[in-house]
Amino acid sequence: MATIKEVTALLAQVDSLDSPVWDQLAQDERAGVQAAIKKRRKELEKEAVEDARLEAMLFYEKSLYENGVEFIAGIDEVGRGPLAGPVVAAAVILPKGCKIRYLNDSKKIPKSKHEAIYQEVMERAVAVGVGIKDAALIDEVNIYEATKLAMLEALGKLSQKPDHLLIDAMKLDTPIPQTSIIKGDANSLSIAAASIVAKVTRDKMMADYDKEFSGYGFAKNAGYGTTEHLEGLNKLGITPIHRKTFEPIKSMVAGGN
């Protein structure tokens, strides 16, 4: 009779809930074996749910592939709402059929997993481009236009020209065919990939700014108007990376602070 350790090793090789191994092991009444079976089944059930989620997020991509499109770029941005720092956009072309576990809208991914998923996207992507527009440009042209410019910059930095664009709720001035998707980062894997690249890139920039401009909590709040950030503004005033057309900074500038 196989030891519990051997049974556990065997179960680790099972990758389907339909495997005949389950019926074979069901006859083994040892508590350790039954616990190992329960644990492995739960793991596979969780993987099946994740596979189904990823498959659903490839709906737009698969439709385009079926129509002969080869290279699809997902485009998304991070940083439209903060009071400080740039808006960052990313464009990502994933290989056909690529599934990256736990890739989702970056806002739904635990921060502890950001870096690992970012690295996997960077390793597996056909091409990645990043566009960055600073606070000065945001103040000059407005955040909506700056976001579009960041997206176009990211698109222009791709080493492979895409045949079609999937964009999160935006339309770009480009001859490349495009599809604008509401909540695209939660409904398209390509856009989700762009979302995590933009998020990690911007978070790293804000962490660097935190060292340069201490007292605002940029490493933690990424430039959003948290209590710590607002207190820093009141005590220290504005920095060169603050958006002067955003309140309350706009009023502070008008008041001479």
UniProtKB/Swiss-Prot annotation:
Needed co-factor(s): Mn(2+); Mg(2+)
Give all cystine bridges in this chain. Answer: none
**Keywords associated with the record:** Cytoplasm, Endonuclease, Hydrolase, Manganese, Metal-binding, Nuclease
| Biological process terms in GO annotation | DNA replication, removal of RNA primer; mismatch repair
Q: Which Pfam families match?
A: RNase_HII (PF01351)
Q: What is the protein's major site of localization?
A: cytoplasm
UniProt catalytic activity: Endonucleolytic cleavage to 5'-phosphomonoester
Superkingdom, natural source: Bacteria
GO CC annotation, single: cytoplasm
What does the record's cofactor remark say about binding? Manganese or magnesium. Binds 1 divalent metal ion per monomer in the absence of substrate. May bind a second metal ion after substrate binding.
State the family it belongs to: Belongs to the RNase HII family.
Describe the task this protein carries out.
Endonuclease that specifically degrades the RNA of RNA-DNA hybrids.
What this protein is called in its record is Ribonuclease HII
What is the source species? Streptococcus suis (strain 05ZYH33)
The beginning of the lineage is: Bacteria, Bacillati, Bacillota, Bacilli, Lactobacillales
Q: Which gene encodes it?
A: rnhB
